[in-house]
Amino acid sequence: MVSRHEKELMKTFQSLTSCTDEGKAKRYLSANNWNINYALNEYYDKEVGGFTEDHMIRHQFKYPDELVSLFGHYAALIEEDGTQSITPDGLIDYIQDLGYNLEDLVTISLAHFLQCKNLENPITEKQFLYFWYNEGCYTLEQMRHYLEDCERKLCNDWKYFTTIYNYSFDLNASKQGVVETDIAIEYWKLFFEENRTKLSGIIKVDQAHLDLWCKFLQDEHKKLIHKDTWQMLLLFFKKFPSLDAIKTEYNEADAWPYTIDEFYEYLEERNVL
């Protein structure tokens, strides 16, 4: 049985996507726990090859004045035609007013929510208004509640945690599809060190394990991290959260990226295992 609220979400989904199939709308929404933004993301990725600004342009809304005003408070003029966007300075102020610091893990959730492609591009007016409007958040307080929910999910929802972890690679990747090792290490510390107590319900990596992984990359002069290594490291840490776990359970025949195999050899050569 579909509730009245769910029916309204289905109508909104169909209106935004021009999808005439009610069953398809229901499937995408139910698969994403009736979160319309996640449902839209999945729909555009699978049905039309990704979300673009064209989707925002096709669906013009009368945005609430308080939401428009909030964007204007943090935005700066960056084009001669008067186009406004939130630049890094404005973003720092925005995040602080939400009660967070730029280094907090949940800020990656914010970037993911706003569909930021990288850390260099500013946040456009269309981006900011469109996504917050569809989430029903028009004030800082409402946005803060949304991010608090994201924090909770980072602590107890493995699928969501994995999504944000993998997204952080794309956020920092170069045009060649790699991330500099120094940057990768900072993010690994963010995910597995500074937040290890909060995230102990999701994943807990022993400090010695994480430190040796980072030292291995630096000792072996691994300057770039590829996406497969990034993604598989999360599963590696999940399966082997400690050096003892590697010692007793690691199987060299298992299919891990070459860099992780090298890490195992590095540990053996130094008699760590």
Curated annotation (Swiss-Prot):
InterPro entries in alphabetical order: DCN-prot, DCN1-like_PONY, PONY_dom, UBA-like_sf
Recorded GO MF terms = cullin family protein binding; protein-macromolecule adaptor activity; ubiquitin conjugating enzyme binding; ubiquitin-like protein binding
State the Gene Ontology BP annotations: protein neddylation
PROSITE patterns associated with the record: DCUN1 (PS51229)
Q: Which residues form a coiled coil?
A: none
Keywords recorded for this protein, A-Z: Ubl conjugation pathway
Can you give the residue ranges of the UBA-like domain? 6-44
User: DCUN1 domain spans which residues?
Assistant: 62-268
Cross-referenced Pfam families, in alphabetical order? Cullin_binding, UBA_4
Under the heading SUPFAM superfamilies, the entry gives: UBA-like
Gene Ontology cellular component terms for the protein in this record? ubiquitin ligase complex
Q: Which PANTHER family match?
A: DCN1-LIKE PROTEIN 3, RP42 RELATED
* Function statement: May contribute to neddylation of cullin components of SCF-type E3 ubiquitin ligase complexes. Neddylation of cullins play an essential role in the regulation of SCF-type complexes activity.
Query: What's the protein here called?
Result: Defective in cullin neddylation protein 1
